[in-house]
Amino acid sequence: MSRLQPQQQQRGRSSSFKDNFQIQKPLQSLTPSEQQQQQQQQQQQQQQQQQQQQQQQQQNNANNNNNNNNNKFNNQYIQQMKNVENDIKKWIGEKCSSSLSDDFLEKDLMESLCTGTILCVLINMIKQGTIQKIHLQPNYLQRVENIRNYLRACWLFGLHSKYFFPSSYLLSMTIENNDNSNSSKTTTNNNNNNNNNNNNNNNNNNNNNNNNNNRAIITSPNKNGGVNTMIVNLEYKEKIMINLTELCKISLKIKNFGSFLQLSSSSSSTPPPPINNNNNNNNNNNNNNNNNNDLLISNNSSNISSPNSFSDSPMGFSSSINSSSNNSNLNTPNNYNNTNNNNNNNNNNNNNNNNNINNLTPQMIISSPTSTSSTPPLPPCANNINNNNLKKRTKIPKNNNNNNNNNNNNNNNNNNNNNNNNNNNNNNKIIIKRDCKKVYRKRKSSNCDNDDNGSNSDSDSSDSSDSSDSDSDSLLSSDGTPIILSQSSNPESVSFKSFIKEILHLKNIISKQDKTITSQKQTIETLEKDLEFQKQLTKKLLSSPIDLSNFIETSSDPNGAIPVSIQAFTRQIQQIQTLQQQNLSLETELSKTNEHLSTNIRKNSKLENEVLSIETELLNLRMKYANTLSSSNSNGNNNSNNNSLGCNNSINGSSSGGGGNNSSTSKGTLSRTISQPFPLRKSISHSNIITSPVNSHQQQQQQNQLSQSQTTSPKNTSASYNNGILSKSSIVSNTNTNSTYKFGSSTGILKVSATLQQKQQQQQQQQNQQQQQNQQQQQQNQQQQNQQQQNQQKQNQQQQNQQQQQQQQQQQQQNQQQQQQQQQQQQQQQQQQNQQQQQNNQLSQSQQLQQQQNQQINNLIDSPLIISNSSNQQIESESIESDSDYDKDMVDFGKKIVSALISSSNHVEMSEIYKMNDILTNETSRRQICIVLEEETKINQLKLPMNENSFEVTLYLVNTILQCIHEAPSKDYFSLKLIMESSRILNRKKVNGSCEFIQEFIKDHPTWKDIKFWEEQYWDELIIKHQQFSGSGSSSSSNTGGSIVTTMTTTTTVTSAITSSSSTTSDDFDVDYTELVNTLLISYVYNLASWGLSKSDVKEFTISMSKKSFLKSNELEKLIEQVTSTVELSFTSDHNVCKGPHSFVLKSFRIISECNYCRQYIWGVRGIVAREAFECVGCKYKTHKKCLKEASEKTFCSSPNVGAPFNVKHEMHVGLAIQGLPSGWRTLLLQSGFQDYEIQQHQEDVLDVLEFHHVYNEKQQNSIKLLTNNSNNNNNNNNSNNNLQQQQQQNQQLKQKLNITNNQQNNTIININITSPSISVNNNTYNNNNNNNNNNEINPSSPNNNNNYYDSLLEIEEPSFTLKDLVSLENPIDLYKVREVVGGGSTGKVYVGENSITGEKVAIKKMKVDNNNIKNIINEISTMKNSKHKNVIKYVSSHLVINHIWLIMEYMSYGSLTDLISNCINIQCNGNNQQQQQQQQQQQTYFIESHIAYICQQVLQGMDYIHKGHRTHRDIKSDNILLGKDGSVKIADFGFVANLTRKKLQRNSVVGTPYFMAPELIRGNQYNHKVDIWSLGILARELSEGEPPYAKYPPVRALFLLTLEGVPDFKEPNKWSSDFIEFVNLCLNLDDKRRPDAHYLLRHPFLKKACSSREFADKVEEIYNTRKNQFSDINFNF
């Protein structure tokens, strides 16, 4: 505002000089008569100004009298409105949280009113008729929506008038500087002067007002009785009032008519009672700032008319407020300006001169040409406008008539003109005309002349109406506010009335359209009725035969005979009708039979496939039988056999050679492998396969072979060969049709096509014909033989009759002849057989070719997907496996998991998820899951949301899927497909999110970093794109451009086969270039560049794939150029921007961020959860060496790291120190190694450690109490007094105050109340190794006893059963014999016992029952009783003996793992006659890596079982790991087990052992079962190094270092393998969300190095014996 005002003043001055120049120049050219007329006009103007001043004085006197009456009603109205406001706050407070402030409604109202969005939202909501719902459990953003929705509902029902005006912001708006009123007073006093100097002073005072009145202070009462203030710009205040006036009008119309679109009429609302409205109603304030003009009423007559309806006033109110306003007989503020046109112009100019505060606000002008004397009364709020506060609030333009118009000189006129030009920024006027009831906005130009005497109110109204009608297109301005409220300098602005006109016009159009629609509907209904009627008529006609007698003319014969031709015609028509009906019935029957056949074919598809396989086996058997017969032929017929075998070999060679590199030759005569290369097929995502045609080269080879074989065959078999050739050509023609076969079900079994059935029928017919021909030939041969025999017999009889004497001689000859004839017959039969065999062989060869082709087609149909390097036998075995019931169950469960993955829900139990290992190792189930998962992700990928709560569940499922895939023996198509689909699920909201997850998977599994595996994925993507674009053109590319899928085929030979054909087909297809560029650049270059591959490999791979993309030459060149440029950019950026192998493109992902310290990338999906922090885990917990160096440099630097000037040193500064510590605490901190700067730098961490130390020591003290009580009861309470003193000292607590003081200046103390932890002597589990560190600890005294807080922390969830349910009634003293003490647990001591009946050793744990520990005991017994696992200690029974419980467990002979881990003790032998003590060398008995892997594996199995039952052990350490003679490893001591229920998935109680506890447990944060994983990592470090990390430090110092720095590195990392170090680092991850669970760790490669149980048992026995021998040599001298 302050910047704009000088410019406006300068513009005003320049315009005023122009006006003066324009006025003076015509005076020289005017005639004397015209000059006299001008002087007369000036005199008249002066007289009118004097009259106006007199009227203003009278009005001021009347207003002063009215103000006294108004104050009575203001308080009542304000109190009423405040009650309404409180009710609104209560209503919203119930829906929202209690954290809302008292003034949230006012703030939201002020912000929305200032921006002008309320009116827009209201109009849109009234148009649409929708209001958003209220959120019952809102967050911060939803809370704001609740407030806005409630306000919108108030505006919609006309209730906002109850709310706007009681607001404390709007009622208490005051001017920031009170000096402005004084300046205005000085201006009014100087107005009556006639000198030019006084006029100049007036202008200066007005300019001062411009600079000071730019802001207003808004005050609101507070709860405590104070006042909240807020400064508001006057521009916003003005917008607020304009919005209020417009919304009040709308609300009143909604209240009266139900819609603001209807205009109010005189009959709709009764006018209020008339009140005399004299000149006393003027609000011109010359000497008093409390009375201001709110409305400027310009009239051409002397009287003013009242508005016909209350809605035309600038501020409308609801009925409740109108009732109160009618009772209050108050007058409306009005002004009278009874002057001519010139006087009106001068008055406007002078008003603008004194209202420079409102330079950027519109003016309200009410013009009424008719004359009436009554005005409606306004409510008390409107009368309150007379106050000074509401004056500065409302910003409705004021008409101060304290002007400089009394001057008679020309200079005064010039000054008036100057004032005119100074205030040309008053651009907008809202004019309300009473007679027409129209509201319009008139744009006042900056260069208009105010001396136009011919302008009238009628012309103004007509002009404004024309402008409003013409400009109705744009409703909103550039800044988003409505043009009604905007103050832009556009002369074509739209008025509010024109806006309503347009809405009414649209409403009329909509009503007309509705009428036309209804009429059209009626016509449609009538037409439908007519159609139904006609249909019924046609049915009747069809049902009844047509009688043509009525339509045929009869003859003139008196007998009535009909001609024969006509009778025949009628009969034919009747026959045609019957035939048509029969045809209809036959068609229906055929359709039913076809459906029935299709269903039967689908059901019997498996049987048909089996029949085909059996037929092929029969053919093989026949061929083998024929080969055996051919091998047994004689040597004379070898040539014909060799010819047939040659044909067979040639056919086999052609079948084996046609397959290219991927074919496999068979040893037998008939090859069952797929000889042809796999066709160019679609991806699995399209759920169909395209059958490829046979190559023309192969066809020619087969035809040549058949022609060669035909030359050796006889003539009578030529027909069969021709039939075979015809059948083969029909197969080729059928395969060339590119017919697609869709999958009928998830099992991938298809129905047999009609072509195959026809081929089978043809083959059967050919076989039948051949058999018939063979039978006929055999019959003919037999007949010939019979005839020959008969002829011979006749000849013999004749010879016998004639030559009886020569019989003996001839008999010998005859016998010889008969032998010769028999030999000839045999030879003829053999020749016939050979010919038949040749025919059969040739037929079998043609049949083999046909069968091979049929097998290829059937394999393409039967196999739902082509698997790389897989034969038909594998496919058949998979189909047989899929038929079993076990696979069906597994597939159903896989579908259930798929639905859980997609919907991100928790309806799958965690115990069932472990079945996935069996599912995904099976290839058939993996294939079915992949198909279902792809179909579901296509449909629901963008619709279903991803919850943050269920994100971990989906990640867990995906991790198990990937781990199972990684462990699978073969890397097939479906395993890679599952990786892509799971990454798509995790990143469903992102377009290119799949690449990110693949990069992470390849980092974790480097064996998959091979381009050969992924080459076919990318090639399949190109095929999919090619088929999409070639089928639908470039129009479909826009729809598929957003999703980038990287799928793949399986065999590399497919790419080589298709590249040969790509050159021929590249010119036939037009592919969208941009779509392929996106897929190549994003999914190829960016993905492969981050795998750590070389630049040349990525470049060659992408260019080779781009050449196979079916592009034209020009587009291919462009594509290769872009690929090379992106490769160059991605690899050059690694040296400058990127840290590591990642490319610069990764910055485009939202989840990926960069650490502020080490400048490494933080991955969003690393297998666990997404992180949005800008600090990596190592820098957060200061585990990086670089971070530690930076931290040390920052803490010990001489000067702070700030901007210039550098090296600033403060001689006097404020220091921090801890005061008020007792001596025990000081000694504890000193012994723990804490220094002052560490405490100052890490105050919260120190407090967390001290709290944890106190709670842990309290727990230890309670256990020591139980142990001492048990020992005292067994030893007859010998040391009761000492125990009581120890208990009194241990139960005392100290309330510590850390006073942070200013050492030298302020001496202010900040009290931090904290309960000091008490220090116990037995707080370390490694007292044998650390006696020097722990013996000097002191227990400080504690004056107060406040155990309630820590008792609540130690509480375990209340069990649902009692102790009686767990304890048996037998007497344990009779059953067991108690022996020596073995050790102690968390709740009591452990003894060795023996069963008196069986003699079996058991472990007996005696626990004292008390009110404090009964819950812990019940929890321990119940968990042990319900836990049955090989790695969990076995529960036998439990008994109650007085106030003790005996817990009987199995006995582990080698005890705990602690005794076997640490170094051998330095044994010192003491005898009576020996010398002084001599130290022996230490003998180290560390476990090797295989033994550590075995222990970790066994412990993880037990932990996994416990975690599956939703429980956490919380005390995993070497003391609680027991060992048996058979090498068994079992978890014991369930005293601190916590149940994780659905209501309480995390815990925050402090339990466990300090050195084995996780950082989140030490800090007091919530934790879950991941705490046990941390303890396992510490156990692994203890097994490798002999002691846990920080064991040499005191407990407090160790806890402090664990929370800050984590676990240190290995002492000797070269001694251990990388798998072991990785395993330990995973367990000891500081971020519990990134820490894996037990099920994931069981699949780690380190555990595969575990030894056998026998080897571990031998090692344990060796260590046990050595330690036993060492202890046996010890002799004690007392």
From Swiss-Prot:
Calponin-homology (CH) domain sequence ranges: 82-189
Region span, Disordered: 1-73, 180-224, 262-428, 442-489, 631-672, 693-722, 1267-1292, 1323-1346
Enzyme class label: transferase
Molecular function via GO: ATP binding; chemorepellent activity; protein serine kinase activity; protein serine/threonine kinase activity; zinc ion binding
Zn finger intervals (Phorbol-ester/DAG-type): 1141-1197
Coiled coil: 512-542, 570-628, 752-862, 1269-1309
Keywords: ATP-binding, Coiled coil, Kinase, Magnesium, Metal-binding, Nucleotide-binding, Serine/threonine-protein kinase, Transferase, Zinc, Zinc-finger
Annotated source species: Dictyostelium discoideum
Protein kinase domain mapped to chain residues: 1376-1647
Catalytic activity: L-seryl-[protein] + ATP = O-phospho-L-seryl-[protein] + ADP + H(+); L-threonyl-[protein] + ATP = O-phospho-L-threonyl-[protein] + ADP + H(+)
Record protein name field: Serine/threonine-protein kinase pakD
GO BP annotations, alphabetical order: actin filament polymerization; aggregation involved in sorocarp development; cellular response to starvation; chemotaxis to cAMP; G protein-coupled chemorepellent receptor signaling pathway; intracellular signal transduction; negative regulation of asexual reproduction; negative regulation of filopodium assembly
EC number from the UniProt entry: 2.7.11.1
Comp. bias intervals (Low complexity): 1-15, 35-73, 180-214, 276-359, 399-428, 631-654, 662-671, 695-713
Lineage: superkingdom: Eukaryota
